[in-house]
Amino acid sequence: SYISEEEELERVIPLIEAVRTRSAVPLSVDTRKAAVMKAAFKAGATLCNDISALTDDPTLGTLIAKEDGAVVLMHKRGTPPTMQQELPQYGNVVTEVRDYLEQRALYALNCGIAHERIIIDYGIGFGKTVEDNYRLIAASAYFTSLGYPLLVGLSRKSFIGAVTGQAPEQRLTGTLAATMYAVQQGASIVRVHDAAETRELLLVLKELRKYGIH
């Protein structure tokens, strides 16, 4: 179930403040609430990751614009407690998700959020079947053609285990394979558990690109 605004503030704000005393690294906060994000910006956060794509709180978009913040707009069907229990049927998952993200990005622009501060995420595992997830990752280039950075959250997710049969903590190799494919298709940001291993993958991929056919 969703936690209250008060509990969310108690959990998140002290952590942001603590990190800010040690590092200037950009910080992302997962929230759907404008009040939480307002406090997060004040504490030093730079990015709002909203799984509702600015649909849950009508004041969040204008707040982000006012604070000159960035936003991740994610696609999902249903709510986190039930979305994988009652899976929706898509006519064409790729075009439907892309159209939705395009519409939400236009909404964000209308709120006043700068184009370069809008990021899209096709929402792997959020109301999708295993096949849906693979279709979306395979079509990553179709999403980057919208002109916004694409964030992908693939790490250790069940679509990998469905193929490899491995438990979440054993899905590193599958995660790296999916990550490499998405990045080659144009994904700009990856959310991971295994940062060091992913960094090595990206360094080698970057080096290989220097010698590719142009």
Where do the PLM segments sit?
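Active-site-adjacent loop and "lid" segments of alpha/beta metabolic enzymes
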Residues: 1-26, 31-35, 41-42, 46-107, ...
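Phosphate/pyrophosphate-binding loops at sites that engage ATP/ADP/AMP, CoA/4′-phosphopantetheine
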Residues: 104-117
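Short strand-loop junctions, especially beta-strand C-caps/beta-turns
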Residues: 123-125
